[in-house]
């Protein structure tokens, strides 16, 4: 989860740097940007699927309904709050931002903006996916996800964003669910993960140089990258890493707020004439992580304002009173 979050921040940050012409759009940037998009969002879906299967049990229609209500609140509140804030800021400062926004209703319901489209997509995946109870259910779920992915690859998706994003990403979510059945003690050799990572990097360079954009190749590369990252992280889980543990507590705030901090700081620095790429990168990346973490800490102290990030946590707190 931390790796995926860091890569999302890096992807959005360097895209903004290139669009602002602070750093050049060269081969190194283009390769890096293309490569992380093979797998950083799939990693998020895999993590979500794993947690869903591990901690949820959907046995009947009542369980499904209660879970959907819970997910609607948990995903919907931060989705709407931060999408609206982003829309307002980009509309007010249209001349200073890199991307133009469509109408508010279209942004919220038809074409969600980055990075919040992930929450939008995840809700619809929860809507159609139930936890499996046995091997038969598991195989049916895998077959369902494969069929959706195959249709997405063959057709390029449909005109409705919610359907297209579910077709493309259901497979990653189901892979995460299936990870709950894997004996992770057998994945204790981190060198296997490192070897897979090296193979992925080499293949990603080849794909970039040959300009390969085939959907199936992209999926295979993404799968290889996800397996390598997961293998490395699982094999290293016995080692205490305070930094990773600390950042893991704030992945949601970082995901939600990194662009809201990075973009204004970039604009202010440019207004001050500080266009040096090193200064922009150091300060921009620092605020992308420090800003959301500090905000989350402040919101946690106030308890109830934390509702915009963790609504179900605050609701539970209110019910105890």
Named regions from a protein language model:
Residues 1-321:
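Alpha-helical transmembrane segments and their immediate juxtamembrane cytosolic regions
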